[in-house]
A protein has these predicted regions:
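Long, internal scaffold/assembly segments composed of regular secondary structure
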Residues: 71-135, 146
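Extended C-terminal subregions enriched in glycine
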Residues: 207-237, 243
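Active-site histidine-anchored catalytic micro-motif
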Residues: 1-16, 228, 233-236, 240-289
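A glycine- and small/hydrophobic-rich beta-loop-beta segment
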Residues: 116-217
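Generic secondary-structure signature for well-ordered alpha-helical cores
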Residues: 10-13, 20-31, 56, 60, ...
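Cap/lid and interdomain-hinge subdomains that line or gate substrate/regulatory clefts
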Residues: 1-74
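General beta-strand structural signal in soluble alpha/beta enzymes
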Residues: 30-39, 64-68, 91-96, 101, ...
């Protein structure tokens, strides 16, 4: 619990051990000792039978964590998972892309080129929205400002404190960005880089503000009147809200990665801007020049 993520105003935590993390986040409803832990030693020993037995022993919505470090570890777990599922077990899985790749037996692919990513030419500009407050994101944003041809707009997210003001701010940004994108200019909209904190604040109140700010930010995409050539969302919550709420994506084609850990979707026909490349850029991913 010593990283900047652990100290997050809304989603902070104390426990770094995932078993203890689950106990912390469930308020003690799930005890750390009751969490099934698939050890790295079992994975490296390719103990398929042992891991399968652990999975078969899970019941009543029990929790499982997998201590995988590399793709080879994930592949071992995927085999044991398949075997347990073949015996009638059902699991709800929350994971990163590595498990999807292993389960689907998807081979390594080269990083995307512009030709692979852009399937329909457009003279419009793109839209970039930055919600993450991590130090890495802020450094990356400053690096991006060195690129010519992008207009940078900082949303005054502190207006969330005054009813109706943040919505007015977002509406003005939407109108301006729509005009610029239609002219072929790419716009980058970011929240203020300093997280808003208040005296005697509570995590619940901070979460309410965070949701309101995220809604305002995603509306800068969802209410555009011009179709952008591409969409980039920086930050976990931001990228989720932009994909689901703003772009209204129900089905998308995963084109691949533009950089390690940065996937690209091609939005479906049902979405707000069909066939548009959507770059999902997590807040803690990449280096400063990425």
């Amino acid at each position: 619990g010593q990283t900047e993520f652990a100290k997050d105003e809304t989603f902070g935590y104390h426990a770094s051990n995932l078993c203890e993390y689950i106990e912390e986040k469930t308020g003690g409803k799930v005890r750390a000792g009751d969490v099934t832990c698939i050890s790295l030693e079992s994975l490296r020993a390719m103990d398929f039978d042992g891991i399968e037995a652990q999975l078969l022993a899970v019941h009543d919505y029990g929790h499982v964590i997998v201590n995988a470090v590399a793709d080879c570890d994930v592949k071992v777990f995927a085999v044991a998972l398949y075997r347990a599922m073949a015996k009638g077990r059902h699991f709800t899985i929350r994971s990163a892309a590595a498990l999807v790749k292993a389960i689907g037996n998807i081979s390594d692919q080269p990083l995307l080129t512009r030709e692979k990513m852009v399937t329909q030419e457009s003279k419009a500009g793109g839209i970039i929205v930055v919600g993450s407050h991590t130090k890495k994101t802020t450094a990356q944003l400053e690096e991006l400002k060195k690129v010519q041809g992008i207009e940078f707009i900082e949303m005054d997210s502190d207006k969330v404190l005054v009813p109706g003001e943040l919505e007015k701010e977002a509406a003005a940004i939407v109108a301006h960005c729509s005009q610029q994108i239609a002219k072929g200019i790419t716009c980058c909209v970011s929240t203020k880089r300093v997280v808003l904190t208040l005296p005697d604040d509570t995590p619940e109140a901070a979460l309410v503000r965070s949701v309101a700010i995220s809604d305002a930010l995603q509306s800068c995409v969802g209410r555009l009147t011009a179709s952008p050539a591409f969409v980039v969302a920086k930050g976990g919550i931001t990228s989720s809200d932009v994909g689901v709420k703003a772009l209204r994506v129900k089905c998308a084609k995963v084109l691949g990665q533009i950089r390690p850990g940065i996937p690209v979707w091609q939005t479906g026909a049902e979405s707000l801007f069909p066939g548009t490349p959507y770059i999902i850029f997590p807040g803690n991913v990449g280096e400063v020049p990425t």
